Amino acid sequence: DRHKAILDVYKFEYDLAEAEKEFFAAVEFMKEFHLVDSEYVVNHALNAGKTILAEGAQGSLLDVDFGSYPFVTSSNTITAGACTGLGVAPKNIGEVFGIFKAYATRVGSGPFPTELEDEVGERMRQEGREFGSTTGRPRRCGWIDLPALKYAMMINGVTQLIMMKADVLNIFEEILVCTGYEMPDGTLTDQIPFEITDIKV
């Protein structure tokens, strides 16, 4: 009754029978799924000598524990996420393929020392088609950041490195690369600093 009273205040009308019909149709659809305890399926396959390929989503620097907090996602995007997500022991992880772009991109807010907020960055964005596949939101683009790449390789235990989209850089006469950071006190480092917003590259 209270719920209905609130809806009446806002003059919100809905057909409860129709809403229930959609809900129960969804329930019946879900019942068709073949649900399994995936940790058993994956581990039995590994024990049988089969190869499992696990693909992670999002970049390593968006990892909730090891990324550029608070500009991160809500989960672990690094290799360790395969262990917690699949129920696989770390000792069972074999090869780790690190896939990276020949330039850097970022979606949304967060530190981006090599970001190009100029015509070069826009050309890179257009040539690389760096727009969100769902929203069409433009990605921020910049030169590759080698200390960040090395950090990602370290925390993921990368065994094989694969570069993609190198052809995007063919349109540029000059290609720049970040090899380190200059701290506010003038010192140089090749490690990602705790506070990265006030540094020079």
Question: Which residues does each predicted region cover?
Answer:
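Non-transmembrane, aqueous-exposed alpha-helical and coiled segments at domain scale
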Residues: 1-201
